[in-house]
């Protein structure tokens, strides 16, 4: 988690309206006039029960926390209430991007909310959520027509931007640290080794060795393909990101492995052939719940007899997954269009009903993801000037900081988890 010097929020007039239409303009109109006071009242009622302090512009404090509790400072309470009243949690995130509020420790503030997310809204409003919570646009569902643009909106931002905060392995997923005993805080020096440990465990789970024919669904920037090829495997990796394909190919060539690794710009549903191992790291989150069946059916169809698949998947509790599967969120709007997190139960149910695959082994490592995100946020926050030089403005920097802290808070609170899952066929010994 990264601490912030308070009092440095961007003013609304500095926000480019064409680039950030949902942030530059404060919502108005009849709906907002009705919803804003309701949002204000619900917010203050909720924080009164939370171990949190909220400071208003007049210096008054609310919240149920002590002086040592996480501090949320609201600079523009009317704008904050208007945004939250207009679009709920999307408005909550946009109000941070606009500078309506800030926190001395953003992760800590968001963790307080995340750990109590199911009880923040009164029961009667929870039952009515279908009437006021935005729905995912059909244009963002991950059909074969939409998936490439959804992936591009995140991963094609700029290789140079991702290089600012990723390590030399260019691995953008949870690491697996050697020691996460109570109170341990891994340093950046341990990061690359932790990423390799994660990759190697997946490759071991999939049985990748000399001569293995490996399919990777979701290339990233090529590190897993490189590690597999170094074991003597032949790798085909597919991605829908032009930027990732380009840099991954360069990194693979620089490693002297271009004869062993092929990176194709291709939807995984269009892959043909037979593979001894299928590996996929944090790809299922981008598929969307409507297409989980086809994702696992593709793996099932491509896996050779006796083969195994190993995936890494961010998960959420099953009840929360069911409650939010049709909800359009801040993360959808600004970070991952079309994405949705499965539960472990959903993965088991889909593979049982729609494939011949079974979950053979599973390991939970959510605490490792919290530490991964902490390190990535610290690195990004230290290099925002360089991001600005690449054309990513202060609103983007606040958005990215919010995204990393929001995600870290989810793992710290237990609202999110991440699993390494090994699958094989049910009749396989």
Where do the PLM segments sit?
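Feature captures hydrophobic
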Residues: 1-195, 201-204
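Conserved class I S-adenosyl-L-methionine
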Residues: 210-218
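Conserved SAM-binding loop of SAM-dependent methyltransferases across substrates and taxa
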Residues: 221-232
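Class I SAM-dependent methyltransferase SAM/SAH-binding core
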Residues: 230-269
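A short acidic, Gly/Pro-enriched loop at the edge of an enzyme's catalytic core
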Residues: 269-279
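A short glycine-rich, Lys/Arg-flanked "PGG" loop and its adjoining helix->strand segment in the class I
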Residues: 293-305
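Conserved beta-strand signature within the Rossmann-like core of class I S-adenosyl-L-methionine
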Residues: 306-314
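Substrate-binding/catalytic lobe of Class I Rossmann-like enzymes that use SAM or dcSAM, i.e.
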Residues: 315-429
């Amino acid at each position: 988690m990264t601490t912030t010097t308070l009092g440095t929020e961007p003013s609304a007039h500095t926000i480019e309206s064409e680039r950030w239409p949902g942030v530059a303009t404060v919502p108005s109109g009849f709906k907002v006039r009705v919803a804003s006071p309701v949002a204000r009242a619900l917010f203050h009622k909720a924080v009164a029960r939370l171990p949190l302090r909220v400071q208003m512009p007049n210096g008054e404090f609310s919240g149920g926390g002590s002086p040592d509790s996480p501090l949320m400072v609201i600079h523009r309470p009317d704008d904050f209430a208007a945004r939250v009243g207009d679009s709920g949690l999307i408005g909550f995130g946009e109000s941070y991007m606009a500078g309506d509020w800030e926190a001395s420790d953003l992760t800590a503030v968001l963790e307080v909310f995340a750990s109590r997310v199911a009880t923040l809204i009164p029961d009667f409003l929870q039952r009515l959520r279908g009437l006021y919570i935005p729905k995912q646009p059909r244009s963002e569902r991950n059909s074969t027509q939409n998936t490439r643009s959804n992936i591009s909106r995140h991963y094609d931002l700029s290789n140079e931007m991702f290089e600012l905060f990723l390590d030399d392995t260019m691995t953008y997923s949870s690491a697996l640290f050697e020691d996460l005993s109570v109170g341990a805080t891994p340093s950046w020096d341990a990061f690359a080794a932790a990423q390799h440990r994660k990759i190697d465990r997946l490759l071991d789970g999939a049985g990748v060795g000399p001569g293995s024919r490996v399919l990777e669904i979701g290339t990233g920037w090529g590190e897993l393909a490189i590690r597999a090829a170094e074991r003597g495997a032949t790798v085909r990796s597919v991605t829908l990101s032009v930027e990732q394909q380009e840099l991954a190919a360069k990194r693979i060539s620089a490693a002297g492995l271009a004869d062993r690794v092929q990176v194709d710009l291709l939807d995984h549903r269009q892959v043909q052939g037979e593979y001894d191992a299928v590996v996929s790291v944090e790809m299922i989150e981008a598929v969307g719940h409507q297409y989980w069946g086809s994702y696992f059916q593709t793996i099932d169809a491509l896996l050779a007899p006796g083969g195994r698949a190993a995936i890494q998947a961010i998960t959420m509790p099953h009840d929360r997954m069911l409650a939010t599967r049709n909800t359009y969120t801040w993360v959808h709007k600004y970070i991952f269009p079309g994405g949705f997190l499965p539960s472990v139960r959903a993965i088991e149910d889909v593979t049982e009903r729609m494939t011949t695959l079974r979950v053979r082994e599973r390991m939970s490592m959510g605490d490792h993801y919290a530490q991964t995100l902490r390190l990535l946020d610290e690195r990004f926050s230290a290099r925002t000037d360089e991001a600005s030089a690449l054309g990513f403005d202060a609103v983007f920097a606040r958005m990215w900081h919010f995204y990393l802290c929001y995600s870290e808070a989810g793992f710290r609170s237990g609202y999110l988890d991440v699993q390494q899952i090994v699958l094989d066929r049910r009749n396989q010994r």
